[in-house]
Regions:
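The feature marks proteins involved in alpha-glucan
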Residues: 7-88, 93-101, 108
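Beta-strand-rich binding/interaction modules
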Residues: 1-2, 25
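Substrate-binding/active-site clefts of carbohydrate-active enzymes
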Residues: 48, 68-81, 90-272
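Extended, compositionally biased low-complexity polar/Lys-Gly-rich tracts
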Residues: 3, 10-12, 113, 117
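Aromatic-lined carbohydrate-recognition surfaces of secreted/lumenal glycan-active proteins
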Residues: 126, 276-281
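Structural signal for conserved beta-strand scaffold positions within catalytic alpha/beta enzyme cores
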Residues: 3-6, 148
Length: 281
């Protein structure tokens, strides 16, 4: 284990010599009272395949993109007046291998899906969440690794190959993105240091009864920065062409899915989540 140093800014710093791609790691957080929390890195670029959940060191600087033509013209092909038709797909269930494997790799799916959607005349695919998540049954909508493409289908560079292939076939890629809530898995964002850093302390504000998940505290600048930076990350590092935000209604209304007494009104007595609205703007 390596001890982190607390800087005057309030940010912790750590340097570990000899770290290599493929190394796994977690944060061990010791709280007052002697409690210890083992957490995955919220900013990790890769994670172990479930049910394992450690973060994985990767090098994102080696992939050689070949989608220059698409990137140059997408401002026009995705303009306000451009015709767009979108094919929504869950990569894990769209097509299954017949050789006993659970899933195809991103690199295998890419040419098959590109050919299929081109034949049907679609301009874009919308991927149900590919960010890392522990529960298959959630279809990816309960994210624990916001900065990591799920290891179910391969590595980060495998996913870059997928994006690259779609673009070379003139198919845009929209990513489903879930800034509305996150799961309670103990290795994730929930009570990250033993306190509520990403969520509200009051369960009437921080708990989502429909899905059993936690609601982001959009009033915290650190939380907003984490999410906004994440959206920009997928655009920069994976050449995503757009995002589709999931469960927006649950973000907008404080009483969404709740009964009287289960929610807290805003400062004006209304049910609008003012911080979430400001975040969306």
């Amino acid at each position: 284990a390596y001890q982190m140093n607390l800087l005057e800014s309030g940010i912790y710093e750590l340097f570990i010599p000899g770290v290599r791609a493929g190394d796994i790691y977690k944060y061990e957080i010791k709280a007052k009272g002697g409690l210890t929390y083992l957490k995955s890195d919220p900013y990790a670029n890769a994670a172990q395949l479930r049910p394992n959940n450690a973060s994985v060191v990767v090098d994102l600087g080696k992939y050689a993109w070949q989608d220059e033509n698409w990137m140059k013209k997408r401002g026009v092909t995705q303009g306000d007046k451009a015709p767009i038709s979108v094919y929504e797909v869950h990569l894990g269930s769209w097509k299954k291998p017949d050789d006993g494997r659970e899933f195809y790799n991103y690199r295998e799916i890419a040419p098959m899906l590109a050919s299929y959607v081109k034949e049907l005349g679609y301009t874009h695919v919308e991927l149900m969440p590919v960010m890392e998540h522990p529960l298959d049954e959630s279809w990816g909508y309960q994210v624990t690794g916001y900065y990591a493409p799920t290891a179910r289908y391969g590595t980060p560079d495998d996913f870059r190959y997928f994006m690259d292939t779609m673009h070379q076939n003139d198919i845009g890629v929209i990513l489903d993105w879930v800034p509305a809530h996150f799961p309670r898995d103990t290795f994730g964002l929930s009570a990250f240091d033993g306190t509520c850093l990403y969520e509200h302390f009051d369960p009437r504000q921080g708990s989502h009864p429909h899905w059993g998940t936690l609601i982001y505290n959009y009033g915290r600048p650190e939380v907003k920065n984490f999410l906004i930076a994440n959206a920009l990350f997928w655009a920069k590092e994976y050449h995503a062409d757009g995002i589709r935000m999931d469960a927006v209604a649950s973000m907008l209304y404080l009483d969404y899915g709740k009964q009287d007494g289960e929610w807290v009104a805003n400062i004006y007595g209304g049910n609008e989540n003012l911080e979430a609205i400001e975040f969306l703007k």
